[in-house]
């Protein structure tokens, strides 16, 4: 039996380098905040994935197949709760600290009371007026999408098609539907679950990432921990890189022609003299129907 100094709770509390996590025992794993239609569909799929018992976690390729996670322990202490709230504000709001009047105190109280999970808290912060004022109304469409990915999934968009799909979703169903789709996605569920605050995950070799993910996240200011995303401008930081990658993917593959030696064909020629036309073989005269001669 583990002692107090070596218990799971003590070990987790001592690990400060890992992601911030907090477990709500009463309703862990359930979304208890209002969802849009897109969010309801994503939530339905998420519950089916959860029922399958698939391993959770970011799936570090360097650990496969030696480390497979089927469950994850999250602390439920007051210190863990405080750490989660601070980390969520920093991550979701792009390192832009709100004032006391701008904080979502109602969400904080519900999280403290165990009424919502960390996932719901993150979802609520991304739908707040403070977030919309800084990362929706004040920026361009592609800039807003790339910040949504950075804040909620811990990565930059992988390609231009991913950006276009989410811009279309936002235009057709609204901003809240976009947020629900991201926080209720299978990717969010697998990597962060219901208890972990999103974090930058492009520094390691995670499953599904490509080699330019690190550079795209660097363009988004992922390495600038002392600068807020709001201070880095309103224009997209990844539009040129994604456009170049899109052009490269659609460029036709080079090929070479192989020369073929052509052999000239000489047809035999009929030669005759005088007025005698050469006789034709196998000639059948045409006879109209009913005429005989």
UniProtKB/Swiss-Prot annotation:
Residue ranges of every copy of the PBS-linker domain listed in the record: 50-229
Binding residues annotated for phycourobilin, in chain numbering: 49
GO biological process: photosynthesis
This protein's UniProt keywords: Antenna complex, Bile pigment, Chromophore, Electron transport, Membrane, Photosynthesis, Phycobilisome, Thylakoid, Transport
UniProt-annotated location(s): Cellular thylakoid membrane
Topology relative to the membrane: Peripheral membrane protein
Modified how: Contains one covalently linked phycourobilin chromophore.
Role according to the record: This protein is a bile pigment-bearing rod linker polypeptide that associates with C-phycoerythrin.
Protein name: Phycoerythrin class 2 subunit gamma, linker polypeptide
């Amino acid at each position: 039996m583990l002692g107090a100094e070596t218990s799971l709770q003590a070990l987790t509390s001592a690990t400060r380098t890992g992601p911030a996590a907090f477990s709500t025992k009463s309703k862990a794993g359930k979304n208890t905040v209002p969802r849009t239609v897109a969010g309801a569909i994503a939530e339905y799929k998420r519950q089916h994935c959860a029922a399958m018992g698939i391993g959770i976690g970011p799936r570090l390729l360097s650990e496969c197949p030696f480390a497979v996670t089927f469950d994850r322990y999250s602390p439920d202490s007051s210190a863990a709760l405080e750490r989660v709230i601070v980390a969520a504000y920093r991550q979701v709001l792009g390192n832009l600290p709100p004032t006391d009047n701008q904080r979502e105190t109602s969400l904080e109280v519900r999280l403290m009371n165990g009424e919502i999970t960390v996932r719901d808290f993150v979802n609520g912060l991304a739908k707040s007026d403070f977030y919309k004022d800084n990362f929706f109304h004040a920026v361009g469409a592609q800039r807003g999408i790339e910040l949504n990915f950075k804040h909620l999934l811990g990565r930059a968009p992988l390609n231009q098609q991913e950006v276009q799909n989410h811009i279309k979703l936002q235009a057709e169903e609204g901003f809240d539907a976009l947020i629900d789709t991201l926080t209720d996605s299978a990717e969010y569920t697998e990597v962060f679950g219901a208890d972990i605050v999103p974090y930058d995950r492009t520094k390691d070799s995670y499953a599904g990432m490509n080699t330019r993910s690190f550079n795209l996240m660097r363009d988004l200011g992922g390495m600038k921990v002392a600068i807020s995303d709001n201070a880095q401008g309103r224009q997209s930081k990844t539009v040129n890189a994604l456009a170049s990658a899109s052009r490269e993917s659609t460029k036709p593959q080079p090929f070479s022609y192989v020369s073929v030696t052509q052999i000239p064909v000489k047809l035999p020629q009929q030669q005759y003299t005088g007025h005698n036309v050469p006789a034709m073989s196998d000639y059948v005269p045409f006879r109209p129907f009913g005429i005989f001669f």
